Amino acid sequence: VRAIDRLGLPAVRMADGPQGVRNNTKSTLYPSGIAAAATWDIDLIQQMGVSLGKDARARGVHILLGPGANIYRSPLCGRNFEYFGEDPFLAGEIASAYVKGVQSMGVMACIKHFAGNNQEWARHSVSSDIDERTLNEIYFPAFEKAVKEANVATIMTSYNLLNGVHASESKYLNQEVLRGQWGFDGFVMSDWVSCYSPVNVARWGVDLEMPYAKCQDPKLIKKLVEQGVIDERALDKKCQNIIQTIFAFEFDKREQLDKSLPANNPECDAVAHKLSQSAIVMLKNENNFLPFKKGKVVVCGPNADKIVTGGGSGFVTPLISYSVAQGMSEIDKKIKSTFVPMVADSRPVPGVVYADKALTQKGIAAEYYTNPELEGKPAHSFITDKVGIQENVFGAHNDMVNVSTRHTFYYKPAKDEMYHFTVNTNDGFRCYINDQLVMRDRWHKDSNQQGYMELEMKAGQLYKFELQHQNVGGSINAEMAFELPFVEDNSMAKTIKEAECVVVCLGHSKLSEKENSDRTFGLPRGQVEYLESILKHNQNVVVVLNGGGAIEMAPWMDKVKAILMAWYPGQQGGLAISEIITGKISPSGKLPISIETKLEDNPCSANYHE
């Protein structure tokens, strides 16, 4: 938010959260919200809040956009990992402690997303229809506790509609509940590009539209005031809410950047480590197979050698990266650990591709249109190296709504290849191979579309790929991926057979669990087959699961010795997991959610996409 020098109002800097200060730089990556909730440790969560506040002050950040306090309703929601589980009381206790910790460091917390934002599917257009009793018993308590007990400074509204009204302009939410019933005296901001009606926003809605003024455009607002459509006193109240909160935190009297605090803070890292240790839940331990204190261990799986976290605005680039493979190799001299890479391949395009049929220009031809139907000449045409959206093509402050794109490339494989071919977009898409329509979905506002097919390509044959994509509302996303199907690697069979313990790291990641799209209940494609291939050679298997919620385990859980739910455990997660496997610490995490045997056991599964 820009400064207004003539009024003595300072610039106010925000950073995404909730599990770290995402500020276009490396920062401490704490365990995700669902992991924090699994600790059931309010004092530790408040320490996390203090540490987040320190990280923010070390970077000159005034407002941390967290915590996320939406209730876990379905395992499919792509942002469950940011939230605090399904229990309203627990979520409220965790949220309140988080806010108190952050704000004790002179940083505003911003609890989000108020209210009923419990899925990413169609989040700009779906209406969460919830009766008043259910709202007050299930969906409101975490926010209410943060207001009444932690005096949270700011609140962010949700993308969805609540009972048919957009949250950013809801009189019921923003006026009657927040200010009337709960006595909230901070300010309310919108989620990014989620204001729709200038009049309703001015009368009943948010105080601050983010990330820039569209409904609150000064010229438009002035005209509406002059016409008598908007009461100027409503605008005065919004300004008062913002200014008094800024003054309450004394942002006008001090520098927010605290140079005495290191950006890479050992104290914050220690808190992240303690949280990781306290969050991991032991779901199974057959015949006390764990702890494993000495002998040969193989560590393998898609999540074994990397920091694993959810994606979207909650993604934080960590200061350090402690994987399970690294942790097991360093944890104890009595442990002889071997990392076995998973034979897999995933890439945005299948190989060297060309923008033209003559195969003279390497890259992908991208075309951007200022209408949603690919009509007329493209406003921008260029060669790029990936199928994906470049958000500043139309300018830094263009929200890229009501636009369409086309990405085209040619590929000639040198050998026969079989791929799993996936498309992931919000809103609609059409995919052509050699000018034949092979995948499509209806062009629909913010519907988070996904397509999948098996694709066999022949050596020497030229293939033309074309992905058309439309964005008519909300954030924009279009991705294409080619995945080689899982093939068992027999070269490592001897190593796996000889191991006394095999730690298989499975689950989701920023690629499959993220903002703006929902995930599957089962493991990502190929992982069950991979686990089965390990079990052929060795049954002494410990599965370490990453994810923001329940994952289907029924097909394989009886075949393995132990299961650890590690959630997204932060930058020290690999060490904490290794400490639990080897008995350096005892697993103490508790489930903040229910885990269904099958998706149909979840009450909302039958109507989730309605």
Locations of the language-model features?
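Glycoside hydrolase catalytic-domain context in secreted enzymes
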Residues: 1-418, 424-437, 443-610
